[in-house]
Amino acid sequence: MKILVTGFDPFGGAHINPATEAIKLLPQQINGAEIITIQIPTVFRKSIDVLFRAIKKESPDMVICIGQAGGRYDITVERVAINVDDARIEDNEGNLPIDSPIFEDGAPAYFSDLPIKAMVQAMQAANIPASISNTAGTFVCNHLMYAALHYASQYQPDMKVGFIHIPYLVEQVVGKANTPSMNIQDIVRGLTVAIHAAIENKRDIKVQGGAIC
């Protein structure tokens, strides 16, 4: 089995992105699967081009994209991606799409086909704060997740796809009172456990993991 794991470059004036830092430290094999990592530009459309080239080159069985969700205190496994770009800030090339479909011919939304609840449960069992998220936002993270799921639906239906958001690193919140963060070691451990669970569980488990709002 081959798993492609992506991480974004820094954006929004930051000098670091925990997604890229974390994937650099992932083991080359997890649960018998080969782990291939690539950095993705935080740029609308270009991010998709880079991802699609990597998928065509590597032919992975699974794609897991990693992104930063500043303000979240835990590692969150995304449930769904929606077909809209609605940027609050510019991407790294100054693009600021508003209410634009990602793919004109795409479905309104795609659900991750990873075992998201099993992944969360495995991280929690390893004492890593984790939960399911029901929104990947409307910036480049959602853009990339949606594109990967759209690609799979059109060209590679056996390829599993999902997205994981991670908190700020500790060094990113210096001087930012009451801003949650997580150290890089726990992030890497959480991602490793989550990927292991994604490989292990061909179907998701039936446990509570929803939200009231």
UniProtKB/Swiss-Prot annotation:
InterPro entries: Peptidase_C15, Peptidase_C15-like, Peptidase_C15-like_sf, PGP-I_bact-type, PGPEP1_Cys_AS, PGPEP1_Glu_AS. Its EC number is 3.4.19.3. GO terms for molecular function: pyroglutamyl-peptidase activity. Keywords: Cytoplasm, Hydrolase, Protease, Thiol protease. It is found in: Cytoplasm. The active site is at residues 78, 141, 165. The keyword NADP does not apply. The keyword Cell membrane does not apply. Coiled coil: none annotated. It comes from the Bacteria. Its main location: cytoplasm. GO terms for cellular component: cytosol. GO terms for biological process: proteolysis. Removes 5-oxoproline from various penultimate amino acid residues except L-proline. HAMAP family: Pyrrolid_peptidase. This is Pyrrolidone-carboxylate peptidase. It comes from Alkaliphilus oremlandii (strain OhILAs). The gene is pcp.
